[in-house]
């Protein structure tokens, strides 16, 4: 495996691409072979991203009562989870949280709302006002995760200063009907294209541990590569009581690290950020995400679950011999 990995890494650095067959071999790696896979992923991260780790924080700006039936989600109105339910926060509240994120070293701050899409009118106008104020009063790059997107809304977000639009595909097309039935995969793909056409960067990735096969993890990665995504968030399922996936078994740490490595090989020059489920899935192996190829991580709290202390995450970065970036 060592010689194969050396050849693959050299070819990628010279402008080549990981093939589907090579992707399958990475997903089959274990033991010492996985060590070589991770070493190659680390070399690619160092080559394309250096030693800087991007820190991302989010605000749950509107929670619960979502009409979508995503089988993993605490905020779906189809399930009884006890997750917080509240309307859109005011622009002032969102800006205050962005300023706090700025002071704590975040390079990106995401405004995240529940629901299939942002409501036109007062709801959208409040978000646009928050984006404009964040651009004027902080050093961070604001992003938005507001669900499905049309061209008019995308242009308004871009004009207000939204740097990045976040919209996960969640899983491979072939597995998506097992996870969500209230909208079509093509709607997600169109949202990505609309955001890019409006001039925003796109942050788009997936959630792993939903019951998908290794082949479907590769399928999703190939889709993201073809979409020319700017940054890739990798999430791992943190099972939520009350959802259909409440009893799902979290991925083993080495399996999760293998996914991170695969995506670094597939998209060597893109930011790969490890987000939700990091603690539950990786446990004592959280610092290994950088050896597996990750160049960023979400810090602070997630949408409906608590994250680690920021000081612990920053220490993890510096203990790995890396630095954390500002915008």
Swiss-Prot record:
Catalytic activity from the UniProt record: (4R,5S)-dethiobiotin + (sulfur carrier)-SH + 2 reduced [2Fe-2S]-[ferredoxin] + 2 S-adenosyl-L-methionine = (sulfur carrier)-H + biotin + 2 5'-deoxyadenosine + 2 L-methionine + 2 oxidized [2Fe-2S]-[ferredoxin]
Cofactor, free-text remark: Binds 1 [4Fe-4S] cluster. The cluster is coordinated with 3 cysteines and an exchangeable S-adenosyl-L-methionine. Binds 1 [2Fe-2S] cluster. The cluster is coordinated with 3 cysteines and 1 arginine.
Amino acids binding [4Fe-4S] cluster: 66, 70, 73
Principal EC category: transferase
Superkingdom, natural source: Bacteria
Gene3D superfamilies named in the record: Aldolase class I
Pfam families (UniProt xref): BATS (PF06968), Radical_SAM (PF04055)
Assigned EC number: 2.8.1.6
GO molecular function, one term: 4 iron, 4 sulfur cluster binding
Any single biological process term in GO: biotin biosynthetic process
Entries under SMART domains matching the protein: BATS, Elp3
Protein's UniProt keywords contain Ligase: no
Domain Radical SAM core per the UniProt entry, residue ranges: 48-278
Cofactor or coenzyme needed: [4Fe-4S] cluster; [2Fe-2S] cluster
Entry-linked InterPro entries: Aldolase_TIM, BATS_dom, Biotin_synth/BioAB, Biotin_synthase, Elp3/MiaA/NifB-like_rSAM, rSAM
Keyword Iron found: yes
The protein's annotated pathway: Cofactor biosynthesis; biotin biosynthesis; biotin from 7,8-diaminononanoate: step 2/2
Chain sites annotated for binding [2Fe-2S] cluster: 143, 203
Sorted UniProt keywords: 2Fe-2S, 4Fe-4S, Biotin biosynthesis, Iron, Iron-sulfur, Metal-binding, S-adenosyl-L-methionine, Transferase
Function: Catalyzes the conversion of dethiobiotin (DTB) to biotin by the insertion of a sulfur atom into dethiobiotin via a radical-based mechanism.
Family membership noted in the UniProt record: Belongs to the radical SAM superfamily. Biotin synthase family.
Subunit structure: Homodimer.
Protein name: Biotin synthase
């Amino acid at each position: 495996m060592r010689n194969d990995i050396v050849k693959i890494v050299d070819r990628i650095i010279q402008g080549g691409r990981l093939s589907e067959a090579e992707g399958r071999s990475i997903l089959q790696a274990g033991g010492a072979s996985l060590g070589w896979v991770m070493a190659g992923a680390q070399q690619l991260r160092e080559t394309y991203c250096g030693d800087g780790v991007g820190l991302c924080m989010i605000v749950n700006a509107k929670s619960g009562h979502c009409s979508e039936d995503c089988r993993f989600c605490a905020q779906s109105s189809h399930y009884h989870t006890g997750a917080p339910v509240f309307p859109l926060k005011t622009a002032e509240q969102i800006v205050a949280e962005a300023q706090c994120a700025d002071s704590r070293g975040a390079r990106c701050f995401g405004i995240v709302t529940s629901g299939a899409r942002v409501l036109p009118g007062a709801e959208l106008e409040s978000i646009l006002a928050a984006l404009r104020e964040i651009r004027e009063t902080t050093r961070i790059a604001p992003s938005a995760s507001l669900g499905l997107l049309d061209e008019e809304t995308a242009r308004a977000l871009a004009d207000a200063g939204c740097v990045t639009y976040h919209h996960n595909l969640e899983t491979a097309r072939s597995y998506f009907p097992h996870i969500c039935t209230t909208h079509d995969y093509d709607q997600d793909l169109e949202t990505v294209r609309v955001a890019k056409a409006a001039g925003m960067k796109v942050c788009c990735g997936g959630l792993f541990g939903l019951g998908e096969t290794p082949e479907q993890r590769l399928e999703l990665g190939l889709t993201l590569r073809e979409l020319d995504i700017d940054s890739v968030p990798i999430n791992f399922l943190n099972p939520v009581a009350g959802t259909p996936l409440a009893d799902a078994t979290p991925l083993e740490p080495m399996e999760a690290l293998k996914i991170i490595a695969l995506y670094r090989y597939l998209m060597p020059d893109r930011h790969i950020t490890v987000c939700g489920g990091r603690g539950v899935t990786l446990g004592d192996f959280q610092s290994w995400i950088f050896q597996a190829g990750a160049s960023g991580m979400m810090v602070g709290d997630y949408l409906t679950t608590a994250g680690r202390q920021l000081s612990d995450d920053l220490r993890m970065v510096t203990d790995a011999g890396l630095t954390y970036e500002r915008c």
